[in-house]
């Protein structure tokens, strides 16, 4: 399971790497809980690596046990249908 999570976050990081950031700025990593520095070319540089980021919990009403999207994050509804656990990806929307 840990290997699958690491692979997932690595793929997210690669996809996120193409987004521009402000050189010299500290930026939230794609997983939503680690931090990265922005290089002079606008790409992400070194990041902290807290391997397991806790999922965010949201209060809402949803269909028990069903997965759904919340912006760019993947969520799963709790068994009671009152909360959901979601990934913590940083969602960046491209300008039209």
Curated annotation (Swiss-Prot):
Pfam families: Pacifastin_I (PF05375). SUPFAM superfamilies: PMP inhibitors. The keyword Secreted applies. Residues 1-20 form the signal peptide. It is found in: Secreted. Expressed by the venom gland. Keywords: Disulfide bond, Protease inhibitor, Repeat, Secreted, Serine protease inhibitor, Signal. PROSITE patterns: PACIFASTIN (PS51446). GO terms for molecular function: serine-type endopeptidase inhibitor activity. Inhibits trypsin activity and prophenoloxidase (PPO) activation, an enzyme essential for both clotting and insect innate immune responses. It does not inhibit activity of chymotrypsin and protease K, and has no effect on phenoloxidase (PO) activity. Belongs to the protease inhibitor I19 family. This is U-reduvitoxin-Pr12a.
